[in-house]
Amino acid sequence: MAGYLAKQMGLPVGKLVCASNKNDVLTEFLETGHYNKKREFYKTSSPSMDILVSSNLERLLFFVCGADKTKEYMKSLAETGEYQISEDELFKIKRDFVGYACSDEEGAAAIGRLFKDASYVLDTHTAIAWAASDKYLRDCGLQTKNVVLSTASPYKFTGPVLAALGEEASGDDKADMEKLSEITGTEIPGPLSAIFEKEVKHRDIIDVDRMKDEVKKYASEGKE
């Protein structure tokens, strides 16, 4: 969405590649104009991409379709779990966007390849974006410059990043961060390394059916 707004403001870019993992609801939408959240949900190594409902898409629809149509589509999504935009609206979106979905395996391959070729350590989300970008360039036969927006630190996802680099994670967050730092020659971000010196404030694990009661409890305690 940020790339779209930048382009509208005059940034000279071509297509904006929307990358998805196995949860490919956006990839399907950008191809067909049909948004359908009634599908299986997958847990992947890029959890911030594990979605069935995209809030940014609603923002894009506002710019392309206007407020009234966006409200209509969101109402349909809430009530039926799906909606279909018009051919003209889809054409407008396709002028700027193309969607690609990549698997965990493709993301892991991107992490390994880029570290080998450029000594750069991708996180699992940026790896999906890199793999999607690579697919787009190969499909189009383009030799143009392509910018991949990196969204997170590999130190937040040490398990799958280490695995992609051919190393085994221990499951201990601190030890795995130190291992990743050692084998890649990169520094652990200060805010993450400082976590281990902080006091643990929240230890409760709450079942879903208890969430409302716990929220009321916390709110009540906060008023005292």
Locate each region found by the language model.
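PLP-dependent amino-acid enzyme catalytic core
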Residues: 1-224
